[in-house]
Curated annotation (Swiss-Prot):
<keyword id="KW-1003">Cell membrane</keyword>
<keyword id="KW-0472">Membrane</keyword>
<feature type="transmembrane region" description="Helical">
    <location>
        <begin position="222"/>
        <end position="242"/>
    </location>
</feature>
<dbReference type="GO" id="GO:0008961">
    <property type="term" value="F:phosphatidylglycerol-prolipoprotein diacylglyceryl transferase activity"/>
</dbReference>
<comment type="similarity">
    <text>Belongs to the Lgt family.</text>
</comment>
<feature type="transmembrane region" description="Helical">
    <location>
        <begin position="255"/>
        <end position="275"/>
    </location>
</feature>
<keyword id="KW-0808">Transferase</keyword>
<feature type="transmembrane region" description="Helical">
    <location>
        <begin position="194"/>
        <end position="214"/>
    </location>
</feature>
<dbReference type="InterPro" id="IPR001640">
    <property type="entry name" value="Lgt"/>
</dbReference>
<protein>
    <recommendedName>
        <fullName>Phosphatidylglycerol--prolipoprotein diacylglyceryl transferase</fullName>
        <ecNumber>2.5.1.145</ecNumber>
    </recommendedName>
</protein>
<keyword id="KW-0997">Cell inner membrane</keyword>
<feature type="binding site">
    <location>
        <position position="140"/>
    </location>
    <ligand>
        <name>a 1,2-diacyl-sn-glycero-3-phospho-(1'-sn-glycerol)</name>
    </ligand>
</feature>
<dbReference type="GO" id="GO:0042158">
    <property type="term" value="P:lipoprotein biosynthetic process"/>
</dbReference>
<keyword id="KW-0812">Transmembrane</keyword>
<dbReference type="GO" id="GO:0005886">
    <property type="term" value="C:plasma membrane"/>
</dbReference>
<feature type="transmembrane region" description="Helical">
    <location>
        <begin position="89"/>
        <end position="109"/>
    </location>
</feature>
<feature type="transmembrane region" description="Helical">
    <location>
        <begin position="121"/>
        <end position="141"/>
    </location>
</feature>
Length: 281
């Protein structure tokens, strides 16, 4: 027995030609949470620089991660399309953001603040890191409401979900495995892993508490950032085994996804940062 995707309207409300969408709303509440939690952490840790500059820092990182996320998606996932449809670069409401690109954008912003205010970049990233998982989880809920980024076909998984708008992608699976046609006829679409919910739990909830409890004690500079890179990379690589690869890319060499390739350097960087932070002389 499979689970049917609930009928969720991705639009909250519409006023004239303008529609407010849940996906965009998730970005708003993520930023508001980061602002609230960041100020709370800055007061608790008595970091005066953060108290005075936290709003500018978070506004800048939010903007940098959004721009980086968009550029990253274009470069990593769909460059051929956007190179021929330049105006579509600005159609953010159509989707198309990359976490890895957003991370690069955030690092660039933090590097600027590090230079301007004579702070170590890892001091800034250790402060920012606990604010990230909430946004990741909220983003995946937005993806779920949009019924996008669903997982791979899994007819033997009892808790697989039927996503009605996966039908076009289902045709490719049925072409490879004609026996799946019966399932499609019976349920209207093929059963798939609800990987948005997997990512919500692992990258949003679990990663938040890992970072939260780890950062409650004083830690060597960089260790919080390193821990985040390691666990996010591991969680993302794991989930990619269940997530449907982007159709324009598919599996690279029929083995690995782009998300896994981009996550591997995160784990390596995290291990190096953790080692240097915890075992430096």
């Amino acid at each position: 027995m499979y689970i049917f995707f609930p009928k969720l309207n991705p639009i909250i409300f519409t006023i004239g030609p303008v529609s407010a969408r849940w996906y965009g709303f998730m970005y708003v509440i993520s930023f508001l949470f980061a602002m609230w939690y960041g100020k709370k952490c800055s007061i608790k840790n008595k970091k005066i620089w953060y108290e005075k500059k936290i709003e500018t820092l978070l506004y800048s990182i939010f903007l940098g991660s959004c721009i980086g996320g968009r550029i990253g998606y274009i470069i990593f996932y769909n460059f051929s399309y956007y190179s021929q449809n330049m105006l579509s670069v600005f159609y953010i409401w159509e989707g198309g953001m990359s976490f890895h690109g957003g991370l690069i954008g955030a690092i660039i912003v933090m590097s600027y603040f590090s230079f301007k205010y004579k702070k170590k970049i890892l001091e800034i990233s250790d402060f920012i890191t606990p604010l990230i998982p909430f946004g990741l989880g909220a983003g995946r809920i937005g993806n779920f409401i949009n019924s996008e980024l669903w997982g791979r076909v899994s007819p033997n998984f009892s808790y697989a979900m039927i996503f009605p708008n996966s039908q076009n992608q289902d045709l490719k699976e049925i072409k490879k495995y004609p026996e799946l046609q019966l399932l499609s006829d019976q349920y209207g679409a093929l059963p798939r892993h609800p990987t948005q919910l997997y990512e919500f739990f692992l990258e949003g909830i679990l990663l938040f508490f890992i970072i939260y409890f780890f950062s409650k004690k004083d830690r060597p500079t960089g260790s919080i950032s390193g821990l985040f890179l390691i666990f996010y990379g591991l969680f993302r690589i794991f989930i990619e085994f269940f997530r449907e690869p982007d159709p324009q890319i598919g599996l690279l060499k029929n083995i690995i996804t782009m998300g896994q390739i981009l996550s591997l350097p995160m784990i390596i960087a995290g291990l190096i940062i953790m080692y240097k932070s915890c075992y430096k002389k």
